[in-house]
Amino acid sequence: MEYLRIENDFPRISHSAVTLGKFDGIHRGHQKLVEKIIEQKQEGAQAVVLALGTASRTILTKEERCRILEEMGVDILLECPLTEKIRHMKAENFIKEILIGDLQVSYVAVGEDFRFGYERKGTPAMLKEFGKKYGFHTEVLPKKMDGRRKISSTFVREELNRGNMEKFRFLMGTDFSVEGIVEHGRGMGHKYLLPTTNLIPPVEKLMPPNGVYITVSHFRDRSYQGITNVG
């Protein structure tokens, strides 16, 4: 999979199937959108995820998002920060200049409450209208719900901040995980025959609250059951 961070101009991509959103955490709602663009690869389209905006603390790191999307079958991940140009671009111009002009879109998948463009005036209905005129198909997916609440990145963040790891697993479809750099300590665990590892997580990674968690650690193709103290 190709990863591109958009600093100025978008790349020229031919025949793309695109889904748009924040995608800071690839929860079950995002996964349905990604599955839709993957289906379009059978028609010769390139599956493109256009991630709009970035958060200072993310549910998934860039490396984690890239790995998950690549495993799902995505061809290109475009990360587009909300620059002055993007934030002030009218929705009509976003469709014409970026989706049609740069990405040569043939298919778009969005959620029913997706908004884009200046003052968030761009809607799924607008995408459908422009699609009829310019020759691309827009598929609008209903909200993925958990009871009466929409599954969203905000929902995932709230449950992670509460330390509700079972709910996190349900919303994301996978367990919480973290990769980091091992920092050597004073060797107290080794002294008492209780092996320990001090892991420094990425600074941008959103972590659960301080506390003790049952975990599985992976190292050199082996897995070790244990407990982890966060904090």
Predicted features along the sequence, with ranges:
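Phosphate/ribose-recognition catalytic cores of enzymes acting on nucleotide-derived substrates
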Residues: 185-231
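Short beta-strands and strand-loop turn motifs
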Residues: 19-21, 49-52, 78-81, 107-112, ...
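Classical nucleotidyltransferase
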Residues: 88-195, 210, 218
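N-terminal catalytic cores of NTP/NDP-binding nucleotidyl/phosphoryl-transfer enzymes
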Residues: 9-63, 67
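Short acidic-hydrophobic, aromatic-tinged amphipathic segments that line or gate anion-handling sites
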Residues: 1-9, 78
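Acidic-and-aromatic substrate-binding clefts and catalytic sites of carbohydrate-active enzymes
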Residues: 57, 86-89
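Residue-level signal for inorganic ion chemistry
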Residues: 27, 69, 108, 168, ...
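A glycine-rich helix N-cap at a beta->alpha junction
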Residues: 65-66, 70-81
